[in-house]
Design a protein with these regions (language model features):
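Beta1/beta-strand and adjacent pyrophosphate-binding region of the FAD-binding site
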Residues: 1-12
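Active-site substrate-recognition segment that forms the wall
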Residues: 171-224, 231, 235, 239-244
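Glycine-rich FAD pyrophosphate-binding loop
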Residues: 5-7, 18-45
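A conserved short coil-to-beta-strand element within the FAD-binding core of flavoproteins
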Residues: 105-120
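Central helical "cap/lid" subdomain
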Residues: 37, 132-184, 246-248
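Flavin (FAD/FMN) cofactor-binding core of flavoprotein oxidoreductases
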Residues: 240-277
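Short beta-strand to alpha-helix junction loop
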Residues: 56-63, 76-98, 226-235
Length: 320
């Protein structure tokens, strides 16, 4: 039976692995995090839950809509979007997809090597994995580039123009409402979006508790990527008070940095394959439109490997 190693258990990697397994292949996933999902992330603190990566599940792709429509609807404020949310948070979707997969968490793959036997992986503690016949990498593009930089592959040249940007997010609980809608995207140089977490399905709080996730703009985040959490917290709170024109007295406040939050310049195609090395790379940075594009890229790559269309035969024939 053909065996695959797949680095990255975000929704792109999970969807790809799910379809490969259904096609009769064996897939071992590796992820450096404590849980699956990547930016489909939900953080819990006491009785509060915060979707501090992707704020919701939305998009127009038919297959993606079929997938997310199993979850309750959420009116984010933009009635043009089909927006859904699991009651336990966006991370629940990733958990649902991972439930039947073999995922090794807390495992940071530091190096990869191709031999006559296949792919060999080494984690940060020196533990080896392999050999695997085929390797798929769904990590953020800069991390993918670092993993494959020692290989003789044309993929490196094809990835050179992809650009990803960071984002800081704040998880905030206050006694008074800050915005009148479920979500606000102010025209502001620092704050990109404010999401009312307490308005989401299954998250009704005490009437005197209002929880929010605030995300900073890409431009501000690039300029302040290496600032301390305390400095970022002070800057966001100051900007928030100017936007709402009210005093903000946090009951809870924490910030988190996503180093690779958004794609400024996407690849423009759903995946890349090096058939000689039996190596494929994909991720949300390929099409660059969040979770729905990540899901689509993972699905298209899996389909190409399982049942290539005529245009894909040349690329995938060495995988068969």
């Amino acid at each position: 039976m053909k065996n695959f190693a797949l680095i990255g258990a975000g929704i792109c990697g999970l969807r790809c692995a799910e379809l490969l397994e259904k096609g009769g292949l064996t897939v071992q996933l590796f992820d450096k995090a404590r849980g699956v999902g990547g930016r489909l992330a939900t953080r819990r603190h006491e009785r509060w839950r915060f979707d501090h990566g992707s704020p919701s599940l939305h998009g127009d792709d038919d297959k993606w809509l079929t997938c997310i429509s199993r979850y309750p609807k959420w009116t984010s404020g933009d009635n043009s979007m089909n927006t859904h949310l699991p009651e336990n948070g966006v991370n629940q979707m990733a958990k649902d997809h991972a439930s039947q997969l073999n995922v090794q968490l807390n495992c940071l793959i530091r190096s990869i090597e191709r031999s006559n036997e296949g792919w060999h992986l080494l984690d940060e503690d020196g533990n080896p994995y392999g050999p695997f016949e085929t390797l798929i990498i769904t990590a953020p593009c800069p991390q993918t580039q670092m993993l494959i930089e020692t290989l003789e592959t044309a993929l490196l040249q094809q990835l050179k123009d992809v650009r990803m940007t960071p984002a800081w997010v704040m998880m905030l609980v206050v006694a008074e409402p800050l915005i009148a809608t479920h979500q606000l995207c102010p025209n502001h140089s620092l704050i990109r979006r404010i999401s009312a977490e307490h308005s989401k399905p299954g998250r009704a709080l005490d009437p005197e508790e209002h929880s929010y996730v605030l995300e900073t703009t890409s431009e501000w985040s690039k300029q302040h990527e290496e600032d301390s959490p305390a400095a970022v917290e002070a800057s966001i709170l100051s900007a928030l008070m100017r936007i709402t024109t009210t005093a903000v007295n946090p009951m809870h406040c924490a910030v988190h940095r996503w180093r690779y939050a958004h794609t400024e310049n996407p690849l423009g195609r759903p995946y890349l394959i090096d058939p000689q090395l039996k190596l494929a790379v994909t991720g949300d940075w390929c099409l660059g439109d969040g979770a729905s594009s990540a899901y689509r890229s993972g699905e298209l790559l899996a389909n190409a490997l399982l049942d290539p269309e005529p245009d894909d035969v040349r690329e995938t024939q060495h995988f068969r």
